[in-house]
């Protein structure tokens, strides 16, 4: 699993959620048609995005959850020739890339963090990115809690068990 952070120059006031959606569209345009189709067909998206900004910069954070996503996205994003991100929509349509960083975490290390630490019985879940799910062939932009937990379980299974199966009875 890898996290790629693209730190870019901010020229305009932006909405982090809207820019994440626009970035997702840009990413779907730069990857192969075959992989884009795989992402649309699969139940678990091995990519998650987050956008955060301060007064002068915008950071696009890409979390790549499996080897396939890493092999498809990382060479395109980390290519030295990629100096700007040009979006079709959004408040700021062009972002000059100031810095690129990659962080890698092995499944073993994530397991250690996940299982070795004492955990509270109560967790606070803060959703900081747009949340939409495809169900019955349509996108649902305001999902219910069951769909959100199903997605979390699928991502867990994708990372640790190499399967997308979820125990629906558990939900």
Q: Which residues are covered by each model-predicted region?
A:
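RNA-interacting cores
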Residues: 1-171
């Amino acid at each position: 699993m890898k996290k790629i952070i693209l730190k870019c120059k901010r020229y305009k006031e932006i909405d982090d959620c809207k820019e994440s959606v626009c970035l997702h569209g840009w990413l779907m345009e730069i990857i192969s048609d075959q992989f884009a189709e795989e992402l649309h067909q699969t139940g678990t998206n091995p990519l998650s995005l987050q956008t955060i900004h301060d007064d002068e910069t915008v950071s696009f954070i890409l979390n790549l959850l499996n080897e396939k996503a890493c092999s498809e996205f990382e060479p395109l994003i980390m290519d030295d020739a990629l100096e700007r991100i040009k979006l079709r929509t959004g408040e700021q349509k062009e972002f000059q890339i100031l810095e690129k960083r990659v962080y890698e975490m092995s499944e073993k290390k994530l397991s250690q963090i996940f299982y070795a630490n004492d955990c509270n019985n109560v967790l606070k879940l803060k959703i900081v990115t747009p949340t939409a799910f495809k169900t019955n062939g349509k996108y649902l932009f305001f999902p219910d809690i069951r769909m959100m937990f199903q997605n979390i379980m699928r991502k867990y299974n994708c990372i640790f068990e190499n399967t997308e199966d979820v125990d629906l009875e558990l939900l």
